[in-house]
Amino acid sequence: MMRKALLVFSLLLSVAAASANPAETTEALDIGSRLELFVDDYLIESMNGVQLRLHSPRSAGQVLAFDRPWEGNTSLYSTVFRDGDIYRLYYRGSSHPDYVVRPLMETGEEVVPSHPQVTCYAESRDGLNWTLPDLGLVSFNGSRHNNLCRFSRENAEGVGVVHDPHDPDPKRRYKAFYWEHSVRSPHKIPVAVEINAMSVSFSSDGKNWTNHPGNPVIPQASDTGHQAMWDPFRKVFVAYGRFGAGGRRIARSESRDFIDWSPSQLVFAADATDTRSRGGRPQFYGMGTTIYEGAYIGLPWLFWENSSNRLDVQLASSRDGIHWQRAGNRRTLIPNGKKGTWDGGCIFTASQPLQGLGDRIFIFYSASRHDHNYTKRK
């Protein structure tokens, strides 16, 4: 069985050198008391004899191995965030059809020869040591002793979760955004609703979820991990995915209530510079996104199709979440390991991947030993 795991990197971004080069007398930007990352040129009027240098993050290694039967052979997408004294982690599992029963199947129904999606839940006090609570919510092969949550009528893929403690309705203080799609199989097991679009669910505790009765909320599909967050400056919820992007590119949508979403807007795509760097047909498979101290920090997943067929991670930033600037001269931030090692194939950063812990910033991501073309990634 292939191995897959949740990993952590510790990150430092800095200016490579200092220079006494006073700017001309202009009105300074008021940044208040917030911290600022020198990840773009937004705060820099001019530079002479200095450069911005992207430092390589230091790996903290594997912190959670996905090896339970219900986690299956493809655990790619995740969400992680701090909630009071704990970190919450939601991650995708999908299992090989030879030994997995679809989560919503009734007793006696046939195994579906497809790849049903499940969503798993874990908790941690420090972001490094994780426990998988026995939630008792979803039956898997006749047992509810597992850490599975249920979000949708069918497959919920790439779940992005937001904690919204200020919602006046306590039943909506956790919000989930995901691609909902029906399982198709030669056995033609009937489903209540044939769906292939973006949906949302709500919860009071982050574990027991209720589907929005008006689903879907965006009439487009998105085969990736999804980013959902609250923008405290624009006072809107923001989602990123591939919905309406036209292939492996990144789209954005906004909502004030997490139900009515704006038309999708293309905001991030590969270009000729990416193609020249390694050849093939580079594409953006997804992008882990965090709003950090006044800026959007993006960790785009570069899929090098027809080249290495692997996925690695770069760094980008934006001041409005729409117009993005690539950092570090497009140098790889999180590289693949050697072929055949646990991170030698594909890397997928979490939704809200940057999490502060003391004087460090953690980057959470999952990794696979096999490239994208391998049919049983894990």
Predicted feature descriptions by range:
Residues M1-A5:
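Positively charged n-region of N-terminal signal peptides that target proteins for export
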Residues N21-K378:
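Carbohydrate-active catalytic/glycan-binding domains of CAZyme proteins
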Residues L6-A16:
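Bacterial N-terminal signal peptides
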